[in-house]
From Swiss-Prot:
Protein name stated in the entry: Mannitol-specific phosphotransferase enzyme IIA component
Gene Ontology BP annotations: phosphoenolpyruvate-dependent sugar phosphotransferase system
General function of this protein: The phosphoenolpyruvate-dependent sugar phosphotransferase system (sugar PTS), a major carbohydrate active transport system, catalyzes the phosphorylation of incoming sugar substrates concomitantly with their translocation across the cell membrane. The enzyme II CmtAB PTS system is involved in D-mannitol transport.
ATP-binding in keyword set: no
Residue ranges constituting the PTS EIIA type-2 domain according to the UniProt record: 2-60
Principal place of residence: cytoplasm
Molecular function via GO: kinase activity; protein-phosphocysteine-sugar phosphotransferase activity
Gene: mtlF
Amino acid sequence: MSELFSNDNIFLNVNVNSQNEAIEKAGKALVDSGAVTDAYIQVVSTFMGNGLAIPHGTDD
């Protein structure tokens, strides 16, 4: 997991207009770094509850 948490994959003070835009930006960074494929970004769950959306795996 350390390759996912490099300084290149941490973004501070990024302006977005929606949760979806934030997820898209984070997903694009992971795709660009080669950590995941675009297909993965399209199917990953993001809902965590209480207005929080974080890409995460599921049991499916």
